[in-house]
Amino acid sequence: MYKLTRFQYPRDRSVGDSQVLTTEINVAAIELIDAGGRIGLGFAQSLFSVLPDSAEIERIFLEQAWPGLEGKLPSALALAVRRPRGGNVRRMTLPFEEAIQQAVWDLLAQQQGVPLWQMLGAERQSVPAYASGLDFHLSDHAFSELFGNAAEQGYRGFKIKVGHPELERDLHRLNLLRQAVGPERPVMIDPNEAWNAQQAIDALAIFERAGHRIFWVEDPVPRDDIDGLKMIRRLGVTRVNAGEYLDLSGKRRLLEQRACDMLNVHAQVGDVMRAGWLASEHNVEVTLGNSFLEIGVNMALALPGVRWLEYSFQNFDHLVEETFPIRDGMIFGSDRPGHGLRLSAGAEQACRAIAAAGAATAVTAA
């Protein structure tokens, strides 16, 4: 069996980068239910468009996703190796793929009676988290407040969005960040493919002359510019973190070309573990980028040498009964069987309240 739940409500701040901006959350929770009543949970997020109504979401799921799931063992779904060809190499109409992986692996770990991170082979229970602002469109005041609070909470590193048409603005933000968090902890930058290789090299040189040592630059050039990534990497002034926008095959090519120092992965459980194996074969460090409600902590704990997981202060917490604990800049795996997240019984009501409050604020402001 399965259950789908649609959520739509405003964000508590603008979220975006040099390329995109979003002010609303549109999510579908997918619950896969086995014969014993255990529930595997996954989240399908539409970042830039409103999801259709619940009936249409279910129609698409029933037509495109459910035939491949119905009657299958979670272990078979999790471990199967597929090689689609021709017209079968395509995405579903709605972004169900990652959510299905999350739900399947959650259900499999529950059936084994262990936390997912333990089932994946982890020998530690916590990993450092860095504070990520998704801050390109924030005011200077909101930017400084966000990172100042993150520093007080003990986060181990800080990543800001850069790639503004005026490089002076990026430099200004780096100056503000250092004022907010102090001089010692690592700083990362993410232009979200805003530059070409020479622009990235020039920007890094300007930042360095201004006294900013950059721990990594993330996706500095378009994802298919392998030669550009290699140019930046050869300079040796900072680490190149790449791979966020690539599927597993693209990540393999990135590693084979020695085009990154760090491979960025997210929350497709099986794909992340395979990518982690490939990265280990090439002696490349893995970093966990944004994953919905930090579900990626399970893979971060299990993969060798992962030192960083991204935390970006998004208002998702009310959707689940309990989030992953974060203390002194360390995020911990859950002790409960599965990946650790359970949909809150009050999630729909909480989202309606947030949406109503947002509408009231908008009317008042008008």
Which residues make up each language-model segment?
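Catalytic core of soluble alpha/beta enzymes
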Residues: 160, 165-290, 299, 326
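Conserved, mostly hydrophobic/aromatic
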Residues: 30, 37, 100, 113, ...
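Flexible C-terminal active-site loop/helix
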Residues: 7-9, 291-366
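Metal- or metallocofactor-binding catalytic centers and their adjacent structured scaffolds
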Residues: 33-111
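Active-site beta->alpha loop and helix N-cap motifs at the rims of alpha/beta catalytic domains
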Residues: 133-144, 163-167
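Structured beta-strand/loop patches that form or line metal/cofactor-binding pockets in enzymes
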Residues: 1-50, 317
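N-terminal small/glycine-rich loop or linker at the start of catalytic domains
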Residues: 112-135
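Catalytic domains of carbohydrate-active enzymes, especially glycoside hydrolases
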Residues: 149-161
